[in-house]
């Protein structure tokens, strides 16, 4: 390397006045260099006696400010210009030929780079064993230390810094230079806090399209292709590192981190990192497109410079000028005009003008060019240039000065700028760079927090031990007095005492052999943030083990009387009026535009890689902190002062609610007793309809979305039924209902509000139950939960007994099976929850008499339709009517469903359409038909008591047999020819969100039949302890769990949807009566969390990570998929039932259309029937049951 001189004196370019003393001067240079390279070995010796002051050429060595892979960086002062410089000292004896070539390549590359945001090379000196690289000194320290001391940067400040970084990296790329070790530790700040990129030890030259293959750099900043061991494009690697750097600037934390190198590698290769809430969308876009796994898809430097986020804020003409200059590759900064003012100043110092010009044109990087560059930089900073009086020999005035003072201090303390070895005479001292001393908080952490770049593997495992030994040719010098007299002899220079080797802030050149866990003096000594960001996996693992061995207790930062400056604001003046550091720190976190490191004490941000040990230590610190206890005591005092009036008002409100509840219950019981006492033998037969109306059993209601919905109608606007007959009450598809949904207050109408009609007689009830053959439906009913429904009854004018008999004997319950409503069930169950057991027993006693009185337990299914004592009543009107007994009596134990489920109910009431995930436990309509016919048909007046039993059993068997035969392709039953009026209809449900299935953005758009489950609550023998038909809901049911909900339910039907929302929020599904049951969701679906930017994990391939990821799916794709799932359910299953029930559908129906009941419709004709079928006299519609 021609540019590297063969000796320090020769490299200085100054004629040696005493050639015989050149060798002692070299020995004087070698001694401190050895000490610099082996601080551990010399530490004990330095404690007893400090080594003499070292001078290399025209530079006075001061302290160590950095340690690299193969070198040590020392802070020095140029003896002529008094400028601070950083000297990188490389021991050639410790390098093999390959690494030595890299050192020469670094020198060559730094000569090519003259940029305001790149550390500049001033001079190169070489001895037999050492290479000295004199570089620019950045007094602001690393940007990493700046982030530690001040927290994350606001995006405005981060943009300014990042622009300078991009300009410098772009400048390198335009000159075919790739850095390959960009990280926060290699980004330095000068005295004006401008960026200076340092450490080109891993840089290399590249050509367009050429791939590199050397694994180097810092693991947290390394691109994924480096971890994969592939050949890589150099500029793309730098762009990935730039993305990590920008994330660190804006967030104050690393996007990829791990406890070990393997974990870190896995996270980098996954490409997933966290985007905090405070990051802007434009900044996020820029980072995500720099951190893309595929190198070819990453942004180029030109695209980064033109990015929207980079162009925000005030205009930056300096950045634009630098970018234009980068694009002009052929324009070199070395062609700048020579500054005559600097040349004149050097001539006054005794430098030869011609030799200086020759050195500048030849890029010699000797003492002449170094002095010129330092003076030129000083002129740019201070705008004036004051020089010392001219002297032909620059070294002699230094030797004659006896007032040059130096002071040795402990390693961890700071050097007093007033005690530096400086030239105090002459005007040059006024313009010295003493003001560029590193910031105190940065200087206090240099050695204790050094982290190391992982470079090319070094086979010499014993390098550290060799470095600790004193190499041959580095003789020791006997200790001298601290302030010896300075004699005018050049050999006496080695007797000058040297300041202690101390941490600095300049030019880190990491050394792999020095990978050791750092001494933690940061952030309470807790967590991974106590270490440097670029540490490799080995150091991280040792550091974690060191953490685990530490005792858990109060943080030393909290108890220490002298907080470490790393976490507290720096008190430059040392004034006692400054607030408590913790108070200042807490106040700084209130600023929403700044973010401190995650593990700082009051920081709201937690590092993604923080482990359990860190959390536990933080919790222990909080528990032991006296400030927390003081806040708790203050909170308790405030509660005692202000909580009492609130509790009193709450108790008063609760008492009022309780009184209202008792009054309503008392009025309800009185009305029931008045109704039961007023029943007589000659009471009009239409009292049945009136009683069912009081029990909230209403005629059919309009669709939930219809303008005449009951939710929007007053309480007393339900129109009475028309007297014409049942046909007039029916409605076409989508048409308004003839009888509007009645408000909940109708439950408390007095008997005088509407006189009961007088046309329907009351029926006696047979006490004998027919036996039903067990089938497949029995097994289905045994394994499924019971449901409850409410039936609406239309008032029907019937003729004589024959007409009534034929009406009840025909299968005409299509509307009943079609319009089943979960809302009716919830409303009915809610109203019946007001019934107390004793009140129900009183009602039963007054309705049936003492002889037929039986105890009623609303939570047991032990009671049945077999009422003792009713056998002998015959046509007596003293007992309850058939529908009353059918609706108010518990389900019998021996009652069994038929073996098949009708296709209509499969379509309307299938588990998929009910959105609950359960199978269908509802009672098929043929059972209800048989039940109602058996109870509604009056027995002949002259028949013995057993005839009604036989006839009722015959009717039920006939109806069940007809339904079963129609589904099994058996010969159909004989059907009457006349048309019949429908007696029962089921209301449609209100809008209710489905809590369990994957839903689209609006469940109202899908309009699924959310809770269509069951006609009558039917229990088989194993289900005897399920809920009865009209049983009150459990007290723990979410909609009824509080008095507020109970009163809200009585006053407005809109609470149905609120209760469903409550059940869904609790993670429970509500059945028709509000009973909660754990939802059975599929494994592929998990509820979407709140879309908080800070709880979102980014994917480098432009996609958010799902909570449970699906391959290649972004958040928007997952959102669309969620809607698609719902649409698939609606389109594939339609109204014919779920896939499970479709497999059990019966053959094609062969019953005539005139008497085609819903119980025998196959799946092939269900859809057409629901949408278009209509009997001549009997109108009905499908009321938004998911069609």
Swiss-Prot record:
Reaction catalyzed: L-seryl-[protein] + ATP = O-phospho-L-seryl-[protein] + ADP + H(+); L-threonyl-[protein] + ATP = O-phospho-L-threonyl-[protein] + ADP + H(+)
SUPFAM superfamilies linked: Protein kinase-like (PK-like)
Keywords assigned by UniProt, alphabetized: ATP-binding, Kinase, Magnesium, Metal-binding, Nucleotide-binding, Phosphoprotein, Serine/threonine-protein kinase, Transferase
Entry GO MF terms: ATP binding; magnesium ion binding; protein serine kinase activity; protein serine/threonine kinase activity; tau-protein kinase activity
Residue spans of biased composition, Acidic residues class: 570-581
Keyword Protein transport applies: no
Compositionally biased residues, Low complexity: 1-15
Segments of this protein annotated with the region Disordered: 1-41, 548-587, 697-776, 1060-1092
Phosphothreonine PTM sites in chain numbering: 214
InterPro entries named among the record's database cross-references: Kinase-like_dom_sf, Prot_kinase_dom, Protein_kinase_ATP_BS, Ser/Thr_kinase_AS, SIK, UBA
GO CC annotations, alphabetized: cytoplasm
Protein kinase domain span: 59-310
Family statement drawn from the similarity comment of this UniProt entry: Belongs to the protein kinase superfamily. CAMK Ser/Thr protein kinase family. SNF1 subfamily.
This protein's name: Serine/threonine-protein kinase SIK3 homolog
Lineage start: Eukaryota, Metazoa, Chordata, Craniata, Vertebrata
